[in-house]
Amino acid sequence: MKTLLLSLVVLTIACLDLGYTKTCFNDDLTNPKTTELCRHSMYFCFKNSWIAGGVERIERGCSLTCPDIKYNGKYIYCCTRDNCNA
């Protein structure tokens, strides 16, 4: 009976997927950098950087897809590891 109960507990934990949530750096030029927990469907961390008024602007966060559009000098970087968008 204990074996059956233990098996059910292990199966429940495995089915709930209690483990992994991706973390990405967020916001812009904060020091120290802050992170956010991404929602379950967010697979990518991104970093957008561009020059506006002679000042570099940076935006970071979680994303469902990896945008690959580069326009007007804007650089977009995507990655899939935790905190890889430094």
UniProtKB/Swiss-Prot annotation:
Cellular component aspect of the GO annotation:
extracellular region
Regarding protein family, the annotation reads: Belongs to the three-finger toxin family. Short-chain subfamily. Orphan group IX sub-subfamily.
Among the GO molecular function terms of this UniProt record, one is:
toxin activity
Main location as per UniProt: secreted
Tissues where this protein is expressed? Expressed by the venom gland.
Identification of the protein by name: Short neurotoxin homolog NTL1
Keyword list (alphabetical) reads: Disulfide bond, Secreted, Signal, Toxin
- Presence of keyword Disulfide bond: yes
Query: Where does the UniProt annotation place the signal sequence?
Result: 1-21
Q: From which organism does this entry originate?
A: Bungarus multicinctus
CDD domains, A to Z: TFP_snake_toxin (cd00206)
